Amino acid sequence: MTAPLSPTVGNPWLCHTVRIAAITPEISGVATYDFEFTDPDAANRYQFRPGQFNMLYLPGVGEAAISLSAHPAARRRWSHTIRVAGNVTQALAQLGTGGVLGLRGPFGSSWPIDDCRGRDVILVAGGIGLAPLRPVVYRLLAERSHFGQLTLLHGARSPGGLLYTREHATWNAGGVAVQTTVDRTAADWNGNVGTAVVLLDRLPLPRPENTVLLTCGPDVMMHFTARAALQRGLPASQLWISAERNMQCAVGLCGHCQLGPEFVCQDGPVFRYDRIAPFFRVEGL
Amino acid sequence: MPDLLLQKGDLQLLFDRLSGDGFRLVGPTVSQEAIVYDEIASVGDLPRGWTDVQAPGSYRLEPRSDEAFFGYVVGPHSWKKYLFPPLATLLTADRTDSGWAMHAPPEPTEKYAFIGVRACELAAIKVQDRVFLEGAYVDPIYKARRDRCFIVAVNCTQAAATCFCTSMNTGPRCQAGFDLALTELSAAFIVEAGSDSGRQVCGQLPLREATPAERAAAEAARAQAVAGISKRLETEGIRDLLLTNLEHPRWADVAARCLSCANCTMVCPTCFCSSVGEVTDLKGDHVERQRQWDSCFNVDFSRMNGGVVRNDVRSRYRQWLTHKLASWIDQFGQSGCVGCGRCITWCPVAIDLTEEVAALREPGP
Ligand SMILES: Cc1cc2nc3c(=O)[nH]c(=O)nc-3n(C[C@H](O)[C@H](O)[C@H](O)COP(=O)(O)OP(=O)(O)OC[C@H]3O[C@@H](n4cnc5c(N)ncnc54)[C@H](O)[C@@H]3O)c2cc1C
Ligand code: SF4
């Protein structure tokens, strides 16, 4: 876990304005938006770490927490992959290129990429949970020689829910072995059927004590992923999850995102499993 | 500075002094059969000659046999309604040709003098200072109000049946965090200054040094409050007790009684949760982002797209109690409870958190 980049000075409620520079449709109901700051100064200062998120604000509609899914070295222009879920994400989907919205961030903790050096790395992503892991994939690819065996296990409800499939071939070629699976098969699908946890169960682990696993997806999926990884001999201190909770402020002041003693917005969203497990495992906490 | 004496007839002079310095006075006053905090104009607005009788789930005003100004304990309000307003604008957005212009709201111009702040309430303000001012992010709304307030504390000379400040080490004596602290005697107040601004105000009032007898009388009056406290919360090991008993059967037991009405969190002087909403003009060109008090007892509080996390009363009551008494310690290095007893008094079904904690100390069947 890493501390926020720097405690925001000034008013944490103030937004920058950003403009939609490009929209790339991904899968049904999901698109990737490239944003640019309207203020060049803000653009020069903005930096994020993989795993962090922004609050996107549509005046009159509301805010939504959205992970950064861009290349971490991106400057001036970066992207978010967003699923239409409710009010804010729907209104956002209505904006075209050139549309302007508010942004606060980046917030929260980040994936421990530096701890992965010299180790095997497994990424387990359920559905849109791949969005916050994509910057990790980019970092791993950019510094491929520093890591051991690299695997991405990506599950979705149906073949149409698999994300960034157009990039999978590049990732494979670059040294991140991508395996996909779906809960429900379809006519044109001859790949794996079952959850990503099934893929993990089958994955050869030459040195579990020297393997790091990062996972993001629905709580149940992360729960079973962690259980399977522990059974396979990965230490709890090398498992990391990215949690999701209702967030209103993103700066530890509104109380909504508490998970036991943790504020998911500040202490998370990325948690080392041994720290969060006593609370993550309790239903309704 | 030695303890000073202010004749009761001169209390208005203190009010005048503070008003003269530009403070709006907020203090206790009787409204709707309770002693609440509201703007007051003069000592005539104080609940003189009234007291409160409290018990789990019950609050009643009764006339006193004397003319005490501050002869009551605490009511349903707390000072957080002035420092952390129930409704506040965080940001305004105006549509422009090229998108949106967003601005912070103007800083408040009014400043308040709080009259009659009790020791547990000073502690509660300190707890909220920690939340809103001393973390990685500072809340500008709270800060603007907190920086400008003047605090006239009052030492308790009696306690309610619901008070347990002695268990939380927050009272009943006002130790710090005030500009002035008063102890009420029958004909006068003993005045202590706790800050430079407090000392300055003292310099402008007709005070004289208190005699040893008067100081002893004040000590005796304050001792009555200590003697009057009967409720106790055992805090030994409380953090681990709560956080390692998340599946204790008592949670289901209390959930069967709790109405999940959120009263306890609304009257709690330290609860800080809020939600943000949008208020738009008819054309949608001017938008205000408004923050409103919220509570972990509301179902929507933990709503996510996939569903509600705390979907039953059991999980919501557990959030309240474990946050207040346990995880608060992890988050802020101190308990979130100051022992004021409001959550006990204002619970419509008389749930008493000290009893719930005691029950959690019993091993489950
Ligand atoms: C740290 C974090 C990272 C996220 N990253 C992404 C991402 O990269 N891509 C993506 O598509 N989605 C992401 N989400 C989920 C996204 O925030 C929600 O889908 C979104 O808030 C739904 O808002 P809405 O107004 O469209 O839906 P509504 O259902 O209308 O939401 C109403 C309100 O409920 C709350 N709410 C509802 N669902 C969620 C939720 N899942 N999480 C938090 N608050 C919620 C919010 O306060 C929201 O304003 C992330 C969530 C978190 C907490
Ligand atoms: S007890 Fe509930 S309402 Fe109060 S601060 Fe904690 S989470 Fe918020």
Feature locations, PLM:
Chain B
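Iron-sulfur-associated redox domains of electron-transfer enzymes in respiratory
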Residues: 1-243, 249-251, 271, 282
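Single, functionally critical "micro-switch" positions that shape active/binding sites
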Residues: 21, 261, 340
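Residue-level detector of anion-binding/catalytic polar loops
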Residues: 24, 264, 343
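A generic structural-conservation signal
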Residues: 27, 267-268, 346
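Ferredoxin-type iron-sulfur electron-transfer modules in oxidoreductases and energy-metabolism complexes
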Residues: 235-256, 274-365
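Extended amphipathic alpha-helical segments enriched in small hydrophobics
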Residues: 255-265
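A donor-sugar binding/catalytic signature common to diverse glycosyltransferases
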Residues: 263-279
